[in-house]
Amino acid sequence: MQIGSLNVTVKNLAGHLLLLCGLATATAQAQSVAVLCPQPTPQCAYGARKLSETLTERGFTVRSARTDPQREVILAVSRDHLKPEGFSITPKGGVITITGGDNRGLIYGALALAEMFRNGTRFEEVTATHASPSLAFRAIKYNLPWSTYRPSSALSQHYDTARDLKYWEAFLDMMVENRFNAITLWNLDPFTYMVRTKNFPEASPWSESQLAQWQHLYHEIFRMAKERGLDTYVVFWSIFVSRQLAQAHGVAKENYYPYYYGSGDTSAIVRQYLRESVKQTLEEYPDLDGIGVSHGEGMGGMTPSQRQQWVEDVLIQGMLDAKRPVKLIHRVPFSSGTSSEPGASQDVEKLTRAAIERLGNRFQGPIWVEVKFNWSHGHSTPTLVKVHGGALSDTYFVPKPTNYRIVWTVRNEDFFALRWGVPDFIRQHIALNGVQDYVGGYFIGSETYIPALDYFTAVKAPVDWKWAFQRQWLFYKLWGRLLYDPKTPDTVFQADFVRRYGPGAANLLKAYSLASSTQLRLASLFDSTWDFTLYGEGLLALQGETTRYISVDRLIKQPTMDPAYVSVNDYVATLSKGGSFDTGRVTPPILVNMLERDANEALRLVNDIDTSGSASLMYEVADVKAWANLGLHLAEKLRGAVALQTYRLGGGEEHKREAIDHLQRALKYWDEIIKITRPIYRDMPLTHYNGNSRDANDDNLFHWARIRGEVASDVEIARASRRGQL
């Protein structure tokens, strides 16, 4: 993508933006601009409104009709000359023409021009710009806080926020600004909140006024999404109904909230209720684009073929019954047997592919076949190691599919409080996994976190955000913009730091890229599967029945996620036998050097940033420091783990002393994390603390300070160790 006025060097970026911002504001005084939509649509009106807001902030008088203005911006669609979702910005004299390949591209063009103006470009300095999407599907997975997949106060605390339409307006604004194009709303049972199914009024728990409130919420979310050019989907888990339906008919006794792991109820009542609910939902919500189906929880006791047939006969048939265009997300099965336990199988892959291909072209556009990339912990290695249940064969890819495309879900179950941003990880991910002709795009999102209520911020000073997603603006901007165009340069993201915080923040993107790589390296080193098996920013993992700090013993024994990484156990065992590792393998000493190099450089980059005048900037810098110290903690812990395992395999007492020394240093870095985070972060409810239980755990507060005792135990583990104790 050509970025026009943002094509500046990193060195000169801050000064460039400050100078241009000042000049642009002065020049704009007393000038008027007409922002015109010759072919008015809700999307053109939205793009014009957002652009007009920026122009007004820059000091222009904005008009919506030609009244002899000094400047004009014309918004138009030309499907003949641009790809869908593409746009061009063409300046000529006092007229700037924004052309979209469709209405969505038109919005992107308007927002791109607004971004130029916000970053200081003067009207007459706008240069020709064009862009088109790299990937067709760029979605956010959003788990709703009602009828949630799991019971937890970490999720239910968002209930009121997620019913606030002002919140949704801001969230959807963020999505389109970052060029996401689909919002997918996930919960166990969406239909109870959306319709009163005609033949099953007893299934609804609501009064008329209560149901009207729920329906207004959904209608407005879908309307606002459509206005912003966003596709909308509801996604759910197979056989779940309302408690009221289950109790009225004596069916589905464990297939309603808070149950989420039960046997499949294939009774005629449940089949009819769900098929009719799907149909009625699509009929009553014309702005809803599609539905996503799952073959997982709520289907225990059914074989893979029975699950697939049930989905076809009930859910997919309900969509087709609606007699209107519908888009389909078809998730790959999670289990290969009759239980709900995870499992991958080529036979199930063949069964699923054949079923999807039988659907032909009955759904609008390609069917999006959703696959979890590296299970629940996609912010690890960009190498595809596993999906939900195990390794994935090439069944879905070879031969090239004709009516569907694969969409990867990169889940985040690892960092909710600390801000994250590693642009080169995303670029590499797309380069490795997003360029194949069978790939349609990506989801990003979480199962154990909802980006709604800000339950993190402890300081009372004013900050620049109201809701949780606004704290993580860099995460969303990086993923959204790079999925649209992986060639988007870092200067685009650096410019946002400077615009928000001034020239002193110019180093923050680089600092985040270095410091928050700690998450990627931890999750590449420490193998994980489902949601609770790792919580990166807290160095927690599911161990037995509970979620706890990753002890030195657990770190030694744990296999790696990335096959290029070498575990402590394998490293020490190989060296003790006189072996070695090929070039390209990431051994513990190499990983230690990487962690320390990047953490120390990140700390250097933020060391001189003055945060005294901005609580928001203080948080940005503090999160860099927290990630960096987590990296330094992990580095010392790895050194201690190698020394301890060497001692246990027959090393000398010096190895034991070395292990104790390094683990004491690791504790000091943890104390530094506490020093950074205790004053500014609340104790935070964490879904992972449910552990292996399917019930909510009320004792679920996390803070780095709360687990210091677990961290300190590493030193005692080393002191108590004996040779031969493995």
Please identify what each model-predicted range represents.
Residues 1-11:
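N-terminal secretory signal peptides that target proteins for export/translocation
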Residues 12, 16-20, 28-93, 123-126:
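Acidic, contiguous N-terminal accessory segments
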Residues 40, 47-50, 54, 82-86, ...:
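Feature activates predominantly on carbohydrate-active enzymes
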Residues 43-46, 50, 105-108, 112, ...:
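Extracytoplasmic/secreted proteins, especially bacterial periplasmic and envelope-associated proteins
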Residues 62, 181, 197, 201-211, ...:
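Catalytic-core regions of glycoside hydrolase
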Residues 102, 140, 175, 293, ...:
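Conserved, mostly hydrophobic/aromatic
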Residues 446-696, 700, 718:
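C-terminal non-catalytic alpha-helical accessory regions
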Residues 702-726:
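Terminal, low-structured helical/coil segments at or just beyond the last alpha-helical repeat
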